[in-house]
Structure formats: C-alpha cells, structure tokens
Amino acid sequence: MSFSSDVKEELAKQVSKSRHCQLAELAGIIELSGRINEKTKGLELDTENLLLLNKYATLMKRAFGTDTTKALDEQDTGKILAALKITAQPVNRQTADGLLLMQTCCRRAFIRGAFMAAGSISDPNKAYHFEIVCHTKEQAKQLQELLCGFDTDAKIVERKGHYVVYIKEGAHIVDSLNIMEAYVSLMKLENVRILKEMRNSVNRKVNCETANISKTVNAAVKQIEAIRLIQKMRGLDDLPAQLREMALLRLEYPDAPLKELGGYLDPPMGKSGVNHRLRKLSAIAEELR
C-alpha cells in the first residue's frame, strides 16, 4: 500500500462520537465526492474507493441511522442534505455552511472528510506533497482558509479544470496529519523527516566517522520520536523541570551529540547525565505506547 492509502486507512477507522463532527465530516465527503442519482434522485458517492465508501456508510449510519447498502430515495436525501446545510445542486460543487464549522473539532472533521474524498499525500521518502482536489475555486478557498487556520501554509493551484489545495513543506504536512488526527501516519512521516534532516546535517560533518554518524542519528531519531510522542499524548509541560528542559533541548538541537547537548545546560552536564535524562524520557514514552 502507498503512504497515502495508509493514511486513509487510518482515518477510515476514526469515527467521532459527536454528531456535529459526523455531519461536518460527511459534508467534506459529499461536497467533493457526492452526487444525486438521476433515476432515483437519491444521494450517493461518485467513487469506487472501498475505504471511502465504508467510512461514508459508517457516518451515515451513526448520524442518520441510514443504511447506504440500499439506495436512498428523494425524501431521505432531502432530509440528509438539509441537515448538512446543502441547499443547491450539484452537491459536489458546494461549500460547507459556516454553522457546520463553528467548533475546532468540526473543522478537523471536515478536513478529514475532504481528504478522504479527494486527497492524497506522497511517499515522504521521495517528496513532501499533500493535496486535496476541489471542483470549484470557492471550495478550494474555503479549504485553504480552514487549513491556514491551523497555521499550515496551504496554497492553491489550478490544474486541468480543478482547484488543488496543496502543502509542500514537510513540517506543515506533519501538522495537517495532526489536524486530521492521523497520529500513526504522523509519527511515520516525522521519523522520515527527522532522518532526512539528520542525514543532511551529518553529510556536512565530513570529519565524523561513518559508524559514529549512524549510531548518533539512530539514537537521536529514537529520542526525538519519544519526545514527540510525549508531546502529543501528554504534553511536555507535565514533565519535571529537568526532563522538560532536556526534551526541549533535544528538539531544538536534533543532531547535537550528548556532549554538546550537555553544554547548553546551566550548569553544564556531562554525557552520562544527559544520557540518563534522555533514557528517562524514552521510558516515559514507552509507558504511553
């Protein structure tokens, strides 16, 4: 499976318990992948993607008690579209009503639905690229504003009659996965990103021995992964002051050896002391896994 498929598989398993978030996510799906059947006048999805169809079916069942294995009639469709504030046709060229996006959790859900319906993300080992393809400029602008509201650098480009909302910066793609709550995929991408940054930095340090470089990189990656996990699951502010200081230092200087890290402390600390604190952080992260 591709990395993009892995992300969607993870998102497909997430179903909000709140109906308002379910409606927001459905709006994101329908407004980019929905259509009205000309014969039955019922709502359906214009896709063969099983992950999307299953997620759509689950959300429709939770939010409306609707069985999507049976064709929706015009009356049921009208009720559903009214609840989703979709009042015009075609349904896949509308923008979301602001009432559906008033809460932060609902904005996250809408973005998640839009990505499930029309998004993709490249293999981070090859390139950094996140995108969602919209039918109209208005849809793209709304989605861009929502993503930028979470401090991502989302941009728009026109491509073959569609409007593509995209993100190229690796850190902002990590943020987009966080927005959609794809935490497993986030950690995978973050690990790749850290490795790339570390290797780029290491390549500039021509006086280092290859074996020591590999050992330092691998150890630092594991340390940063542990700190990121603590940050996501618990928050660094909850740590004892000494461990919080060490965690922040490791994040600020991802490629620094233990001796250099110790020099940034006040008073300075030796390699063994730095290593002891980093091991404590790793132990905390292990308990959270």
Roles of regions detected by a PLM:
Residues 278-289:
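Short, solvent-exposed alpha-helical "recognition" segments
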